[in-house]
């Protein structure tokens, strides 16, 4: 079985990598298990040495790593370079802050001393998607490794070159520091083979990023094996714009949020819920900004919107747009399949969308913006929560009003007057069908530790 990477800007196959055989899977898991004791005993300073080396290697090789993303999943080169830097920052952040995050906590009780310490679980499997190959790998691996676990990366089969390159970065860092290679290993697999790896006794936990359907499948297997899982799943993120918002700033940020990575982001603003009083003014601004975007070759540094990653994804996106227009939404921009090679899709603006239309009910994974009207702030809040998803949200209003509204939005993170983004310093994750558990920040590193309570009685004798 081959894992095949296709350039989405041309439709041409650019790489074929053999999937791991059952024997190679066994060898990989055995190596990860064998490395656990040495990695755990290396201590935080020794682990930090490796993560700092990973960060340095990512930065030194950014010009060769970033084009892999552009080639295999169509990310514009300017964004790809930014992603490599963000991945390096994540490694660096946990190298510098894991000791504080994992510090032993003394807790008063009837003991002479009682405390909580954070111990590694063992080997953590990361099952990751294609849309941010380097960032998501480091988001998973950096905290897991700094907590003393070993990590096995099962990346999306459409980005095998990225996965190999990530494995090589870690291999160099581990070799230079004298750590076992089994601390971090790349495992090229088809999606159908993941369940067997989760069931393996040598895997203690799993981190999954991807669709709600995929997350449900992973959660079912992990639950049957009584293994912890963190799920970061899809989102249909609301962006609420109230009458007292700065419309120019809101339009700039909303347009940027929706077209980063050609709109293929779980935390992008997808449902723009606008108070009636400023609806027309905001829509005019959004249309102007989307119309001015440069769509084209992702290798061109001037390109702002690249292709959709796969043909089937573009077909599904166009279906969502078509069904929404057929249901009564107004198509103000885009919405047509372009001629020529590759899987491009134009920035698309849909107005007068209602919460029962396809573009509001389903997650749209592409540069498609759906605008919904709300008569007032209460109606906007109701619309924001009218979804099965709960990953992220944003609110444009006064800071005080935005913070008050955030408490009533069912989402794992809310940005007030700013773009929703992931940050190594801050936890992120979802509720409802957007998953459970948290990535990043002090909360993320504690997802894959044994929070061990120790109770010490008086000295005997």
Give the location of each predicted region.
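N-terminal Rossmann-like NAD(P)+-binding subdomain of aldehyde/semialdehyde dehydrogenases
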Residues: 1-112
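Residues at or immediately preceding the N-termini of alpha-helices
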Residues: 8, 22-25, 44, 62, ...
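Short, well-ordered beta-strand elements within core beta-sheets of diverse protein domains
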Residues: 13-20, 35-41, 126, 239-242, ...
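Structural signal for hydrophobic packing residues in well-ordered secondary-structure cores
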Residues: 36, 40, 55-62, 66, ...
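Rossmann-like NAD(P) dinucleotide-binding subdomain of oxidoreductase/dehydrogenase enzymes
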Residues: 107-249, 374
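ALDH superfamily catalytic-core signature
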Residues: 213-354, 416
